[in-house]
A protein has these predicted regions:
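N-terminal cationic and glycine-rich segments that engage phosphates or anionic surfaces
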Residues: 1-71, 78-410
Length: 410
């Protein structure tokens, strides 16, 4: 949060914040949300970590299209390390482009409308903005990688999670202020809060829901010992893709808004920005479609029925009533496709409903939008699972170390 209070040199923050409160500035809401409110402060983290996520989406597409990258992705840990390095470079390059674009098309527009006295739009100011934003993105990437490596959970997701959650209290306080002035009805506000609580409960239940496919292992008699014969299961989650499709959908939705919104005097570009604005019906519909699409795509990447079927056959396992090999692959594909359909429809519904409730109650808050709530719930549950697994691992380590100590004392 310290970086949120380090502004970009030469930018008039009061004018930026005043503009973002207008109808024209409202299209920047989703960019401001995923930067943790840093865009309205135009701090060194104004672009957030979204340039890196956009680069990651582009890289995943290139891996499936470019044979050299596809081959590299199959070379194990070393190949993944090189692809990650390419993604980092792409994220920083994209951040530099976005910083330059903002400096020229937005901040420097109309003779420097958003600049402090003594500053003027030109090469020096453009250079300062680009260097500041690239440094901010590089620092966020470094922190995300350190969190992933030494902390608990995915660093990139946790940074986005923190950026959304930190906006909740200001949004609630702002709404309470509107209640006092009579602009928002108290009953509508209580209804909105009740819906948020129910939405959290429903999302958590669906994120945890899974279909358990029974697996039986054949018995093997070696001498006087019997091996195998255990019964277990394959857990397939209703939402196997997790929170990644939602983050990817938000990243894609930001691109046309980011490119069109700064041109305030161009009605065509403003129309494009408004069309993709997730608070409008058109933008909300596109957002739902993107969430459903990325859910299917990422589930296909994460869950490989062929690999699971081969693993079962290798270790003597089988699904009761299903023959090993190709029948098992087809059975798993059928189950996954059905679960993914319902999971994707649920994610689409949850993306849609909060905006409808906001329109009905008159409480507009992008921090409590469907996409924001889904990210918060998904990241929180993923992190909680990792914390539980770490605690379990530590308890086993403690048990084993005590056993070793007792053995030495004998």
């Amino acid at each position: 949060r310290l970086g949120a209070f380090i502004p970009t040199p030469g930018v008039d923050l009061d004018k930026i914040q005043e503009f973002l409160r207008t109808a024209q500035g409202g299209v920047f809401g989703i960019i401001n949300l995923f930067s943790g409110g840093n865009f309205e402060r135009f701090s060194i983290f104004a672009l957030g970590i979204m340039p890196y996520i956009t680069a990651a989406i582009i890289m995943q597409i290139l891996v499936t299209v470019v044979p050299a990258l596809e081959k590299l992705s199959k070379e194990g840990e070393e190949g993944r390390r090189i692809i990650n390095q390419y993604t980092r470079i792409g994220g920083i390059a994209l951040g530099a482009f976005q910083g330059f674009f903002l400096a020229t098309a937005f901040l420097g527009a109309e003779g420097g409308r958003f600049l402090l006295p003594g500053w003027s739009p030109g090469p020096f100011f453009w250079f300062v903005v680009v260097v500041t934003q690239v440094a901010g993105i590089a620092l966020l990437l470094w922190m995300a990688e350190r969190i992933t490596e030494y902390g608990i959970g995915n660093g990139t997701s946790l940074i986005i999670f923190a950026g959304i959650v930190v906006e909740w209290l200001p949004q609630i306080l702002r709404t309470i202020g509107l209640i006092r002035t009579g602009e928002v009805n108290l009953v509508a506000f209580l209804f909105f809060l009740a819906f948020i609580v129910l939405a959290f409960a429903g999302m958590a239940a669906v994120q945890q829901a899974e279909r358990r496919i029974p697996v039986q292992y054949a018995r093997k008699v070696v001498g006087r010992r019997v091996y195998g014969g255990q019964a277990t299961y394959i857990p397939i989650k209703l939402n196997a893709a997790g929170v990644i499709p939602i983050i990817f959908a938000a990243a894609i939705l930001q691109i046309p808004i980011f490119l069109a919104a700064p041109f305030q005097d161009n009605p065509v570009l403003q129309g494009i920005a408004n069309f993709f604005n997730p608070t409008r019906p058109s933008g909300l519909f596109i957002e739902v479609l993107l969430v459903i699409l990325f859910t299917y795509v990422y589930t296909a990447v994460q869950f490989d029925p062929k690999r699971i079927a081969e693993s079962l056959r290798e270790y003597g396992g089988f699904i009761p009533g299903i023959r090993p090999g190709e029948p098992t692959v087809k059975f798993l594909e059928h189950i996954v496709s059905r679960l993914t359909l319902w999971g994707a429809l649920f994610l689409g519904l949850v993306t849609l409903l909060p905006q409808i409730i906001q329109n009905l109650t008159g409480i507009q808050s992008i921090a409590f939008s469907g996409i924001g709530l889904l990210i918060v719930v998904g990241v929180a549950l993923d992190t909680l699972r990792q914390v539980e697994s770490q605690l379990m691992l530590r308890s086993y380590e403690g048990f084993l170390s005590r056993g070793r100590l007792r053995g030495r004392n004998r």
